[in-house]
Amino acid sequence: MKAVGLVVEYNPFHNGHRYHLAQAKRLTGADVVVAVMSGDFTQRGEPTILDKWSRTLAALQNGVDLVVELPVADAVQPAHRFAMGALSLLNDLQVADVVFGAEHPDWDFAAMVKAEQDFNQAAFHQFNNTYATQFNQQLEAVTGHALTDPNDILAFAYHRAKAAGDFGFHLQPIQRVDNHYADQQLTGAISSAGAIRQAVKGHQDVTETVPVQTASALAKLTTIPNWEQLYPLLANHLIQTPAPLLEQTYQVKEGLENRLKEAAERHRDFTSFLKAVKTKRYTYGRLMRVAFYLTLNLSDQDMANYHPYHRVLGFTAAGQAYLHQVKKELSYPLITKVNQRMKNAELALDYRAGKLYQFFGTPEQDLTRGPIRLV
């Protein structure tokens, strides 16, 4: 059986995603679709609007055959780490192709990756701008293109990861079909995930934009997960923890701990807290991830101890058959059910993330849950 791989968040699963996976299957002639999906928190460190099980079910009922969770240690990361983590899993699962949306699928991303060797490295030691801004200035000077759209950024990261990882699959970008990620207005049947989330918050009807499974799950929401709800946990942690201990948190370095601590003492809501910490050096995306690391109490040692694995969230009959085909050749552990030992060992970070997500009133995310089976 031939498999095509997708890297997804499905936040939530919508009609654009259904188009993407149908195109992926058509372009590659694959027998099965394998999706590596973020769990309950996105790449930016935000809680997903629906939990990973609801999103897995919608994916399986709309064309995906196997859903594997991207561990939180790789899921809540900048594009380069996110891409490497996801593609490592797909490569181990022996997919033949990885298909992804991009704003400019005609760009030669592989050539853009090679162009990095011509960058002026001295320019990156200036701290009056974020690394991303300085990187784009260099990239545009060398290639004529700047990475300003999120899917183009990921496309570049996928090509960089493939070059570094020597992966065996083929990368295939396709045209993104929904409205721009920053657009907050619905644009008919094909609308962005961001616009759909905003519409749900505003109590608008989104049934035209999502499959019936997603619409049903959204209709049952009693609260929309957001950082304002988690902020008391974050603020308390920052206020109660001495700065030297905060510095042991992953990605909290170079005085950022003092800035975070001071902001937590002064601000009572997450939005004003984030604005107080923001500088030209730190993007909002990075600060959102740092907020997640702090609330999860994710340390440098936690990250050093992390090793990849395949946590299966669900499969169809075809997905089950494919998993049986490849499982004996996997380099990473295959996990279908979480036990008491795992929650304190290899799955400790994902277990903690699931417990954090339960603050939104959701059921247990890990210990009592096995893969969803549509067989």
Swiss-Prot record:
Q: Which key words are in the record?
A: ATP-binding, Cytoplasm, Ligase, Nucleotide-binding, RNA-binding, tRNA processing, tRNA-binding
Asked if the keyword Metal-binding belongs to this entry, the reply reads no
* UniProt-listed InterPro entries: Rossmann-like_a/b/a_fold, tRNA(Met)_cyd_acetate_ligase
Q: What is this protein called?
A: tRNA(Met) cytidine acetate ligase
**Which residues are listed for ATP binding in this entry?**
7-20, 101, 151, 176
Which species is this UniProt entry from?
A: Limosilactobacillus fermentum (strain NBRC 3956 / LMG 18251) (Lactobacillus fermentum)
Q: Which gene is this protein's source?
A: tmcAL
Q: What does this protein do, in the record's words?
A: Catalyzes the formation of N(4)-acetylcytidine (ac(4)C) at the wobble position of elongator tRNA(Met), using acetate and ATP as substrates. First activates an acetate ion to form acetyladenylate (Ac-AMP) and then transfers the acetyl group to tRNA to form ac(4)C34.
Where it sits in the cell: the answer is: Cytoplasm
**GO BP terms:** tRNA modification
Principal location: cytoplasm
Q: List the disulfide bonds.
A: none
This protein's GO CC annotations: cytoplasm
Q: Specify the domain of life of the species encoding this protein.
A: Bacteria
Catalytic reactions of this protein? cytidine(34) in elongator tRNA(Met) + acetate + ATP = N(4)-acetylcytidine(34) in elongator tRNA(Met) + AMP + diphosphate
Coiled coil regions in record = none
Q: What is its EC number?
A: 6.3.4.-
